[in-house]
Curated annotation (Swiss-Prot):
InterPro entries: Nab2/ZC3H14, Znf_CCCH. This is Zinc finger CCCH domain-containing protein 14. Keywords: Acetylation, Cytoplasm, Differentiation, Disease variant, Intellectual disability, Isopeptide bond, Metal-binding, Nucleus, Phosphoprotein, Repeat, RNA-binding, Spermatogenesis, Ubl conjugation, Zinc, Zinc-finger. Gene3D superfamilies: 4.10.1000.30, 4.10.1000.40, PWI domain. Homodimer; facilitating circular RNAs (circRNAs) formation. Associates with the spliceosome. Interacts with HOOK2. Interacts with ZFC3H1 in a RNase-sensitive manner. The gene is ZC3H14. It comes from Homo sapiens (Human). It comes from the Eukaryota. It is found in: Nucleus speckle. The keyword Transport does not apply.
Amino acid sequence: MEIGTEISRKIRSAIKGKLQELGAYVDEELPDYIMVMVANKKSQDQMTEDLSLFLGNNTIRFTVWLHGVLDKLRSVTTEPSSLKSSDTNIFDSNVPSNKSNFSRGDERRHEAAVPPLAIPSARPEKRDSRVSTSSQESKTTNVRQTYDDGAATRLMSTVKPLREPAPSEDVIDIKPEPDDLIDEDLNFVQENPLSQKKPTVTLTYGSSRPSIEIYRPPASRNADSGVHLNRLQFQQQQNSIHAAKQLDMQSSWVYETGRLCEPEVLNSLEETYSPFFRNNSEKMSMEDENFRKRKLPVVSSVVKVKKFNHDGEEEEEDDDYGSRTGSISSSVSVPAKPERRPSLPPSKQANKNLILKAISEAQESVTKTTNYSTVPQKQTLPVAPRTRTSQEELLAEVVQGQSRTPRISPPIKEEETKGDSVEKNQGTQQRQLLSRLQIDPVMAETLQMSQDYYDMESMVHADTRSFILKKPKLSEEVVVAPNQESGMKTADSLRVLSGHLMQTRDLVQPDKPASPKFIVTLDGVPSPPGYMSDQEEDMCFEGMKPVNQTAASNKGLRGLLHPQQLHLLSRQLEDPNGSFSNAEMSELSVAQKPEKLLERCKYWPACKNGDECAYHHPISPCKAFPNCKFAEKCLFVHPNCKYDAKCTKPDCPFTHVSRRIPVLSPKPAVAPPAPPSSSQLCRYFPACKKMECPFYHPKHCRFNTQCTRPDCTFYHPTINVPPRHALKWIRPQTSE
C-alpha cells in the first residue's frame, strides 16, 4: 500500500487530532515521527515501544486506534481488487452501464442528478483548473451494481477522515501547441443534443474539500463521442468549476492544472481524442508518441492509477508509464487555492516547524544575553557610585542621618564650587523642601553646602564608574586648625547627611573663578585615645565641636541598638549646646546588656551566676547523645554521669556536676638518645667489637687491598684478608 500525498495529509491530520485528544500533542515533530513509522510498516508492538516515551499511559490506546484505521484502509483496498475484470473495455461494449466506480475508500458518496452548472468556483478570478479523467478496466454490470450499492454505504461509516491513495500513477503531460486544432470536433459536440442530458454524480468529501461532479458517458455512445461530450461540458462550465483530486480505489485518471477555458488549451485535446482512432490501443500509442515528443513545461497531465498487491512501498510519480487500457471517464477538480509545487517531494523537504523553532530559540537566547565586565573585581569592599541621587533622596538621607552616629574618615581634601543662577534656583527649591520636612535651620544650611559639594562632584567626575570606599577606624579623631573649622563642619555634616563612606581622593579643580575652599588637613592629629593626655583632650574640644563616637558598626545603629538607645542617641545629636547629661549617658550604658557567648559554662549546672552568667546554660536535651562528638562542650543537656567527680574517662559524654580531678596521662617512654659520634678514631679499630662505640670507625674500601686509586679515602687494612672463597660458609655434613 503506497501512501500518496493526499492520503498522507489526511492520515497526518487524523493522527494530530488524536494526539490533541489524548493531550500529547506538543509540536509537529511527533506526527512526523509517527508518519515515518507508518511508512516503514512498523508493527503495533514496535510502535508501542517507540511511542511509550511520548504518550505514556495512552500509548496502547493510540497504537490500537492507529492500526485499526490502517487495517480498515487495507481492507478497503483489497476488497475492490477481487472484483476486477480486465478482459473487456467499457467503450468497446454496447452493454449500457448506469453506474461507475469512483472514489472508493473513505469518501462519502452522494448520488444526485445535478446539472453541471451547479459547481461554483472558489476563486472566480482564477482561470486555472485541474481536470482529471479516469480510465476504468471493464467490469460486468452485475458486479458493478452490487459493489456500488453495498460498498458505498459501508465505506461511508468506516473510515471518515482518511482517503486511500492510488498505489501508482501513469502520467502524461499535454502541452498545447498552435497547430492543435479541434474546432470541427467542438462544433460537432455542440450540435449534439445528448450533451444537455448527461447524468451526473456529485461526490462530497467529508473534510473541507470542494465537491466533484463525475460525468458518465452514455451507453449508446462509443468511446470517442463520450469523450467529446465530456469536453464540451467542461468548456461550457469552466469559469465556475473547482474541485480537488479524486482518488479511485481501482484506477483513476487525474488531470493536473489546465486552462480549458482558452481555445489553445482545448486545441491540445485534438491529438489525444480524435475520431480517427477506432480502438483504444492505437489511441494510447499515439498519446505516448505525442508525450515523448514534447518535453516542455507541464500545462496539463493525464494520470492513470495502477493497482499493486499490498507491496506497501511508496514510489514517486513517474512521468513515463506504459500503455493503458480501460474506459475514459472525466471529472473536474480545481484547487481552492493554487499552490506552488515544490521541486522536492514532501518526504525530502525541510520541516518548517524545526526552522521556526530554532529561530525563536535563537531570539530568546539573544534577549537573555547579558554583558559582564571583563575586569575582575580584586577587592570586596563596599562600592558607592560617583553620580549622586536626586534632591528628595538626599533629604531622606538627612532625616535618617539624625538617628545615626557621624563618621569621620581619614583626612579629605575637598573643593566646592558654587554656580550663580543655577544654584540660586536649587537653593530656593531646597528651602521649600526643608520647610515641608520641618528641618531646623542648622541642618538646612549644612544640606545646602552638601548639595553644592555634590553638584561640583558630579560636574567634575562625569563618568558613571564606581570607586571603592575605605573604612575609617572608629577610634580616630581629627583636629583642625581654627581657621579651617568651617571646612571640618562641612565634612562632618556631609558624613551625617549621606550615611556613606567617601573615598579619600583629591578632586580636580574646575575652571571657574575663585571660590571658597574647604580643606581638612592632618595638622595636630593626636595620639590614639588610650594614650592621650588631659591637655591634648582639652585642645581637641577647644578646636572643634565634640563628635560622639560609639562602638556600633558602620552599617548603622538601627540593627544593633534598642529603641531606647536610639532615642537617647537622637536626643544627643539634636542637642546643639552639648548639654547631654551624664544621667542620660548612664541610662544608655544600663540599657546595653551583654549578649551571652555561645560557649557552654564550665560550672553548669552548679553555676552561681544563674541567668546573669555570660556563658550558655543548656536547656533542651541533646538529640545526638550518646553519639555526640562535642562531649562536655555540647550546648545541649547530657545525662549525669554516675561516677561524677570520680570519673576517670577523659572523653566521657555524660554531665559531671562536681569538678573532676584531672588524671595525668602517663608519660611516654623516651628512647635513650643515641651516643654522639666523635671524630676521634677508635683506638681499637679495626678490632673494636663494641657495637655502641662512640668513636669513629672508618669505612672499608670495597676493593680492599686490591684498590689501585692512590687518593682513595676509604680504609684499606694493612693485614692480608683471606680470599673470597675462603670467606664462604658451607654447612658441615652430618653423619647418619
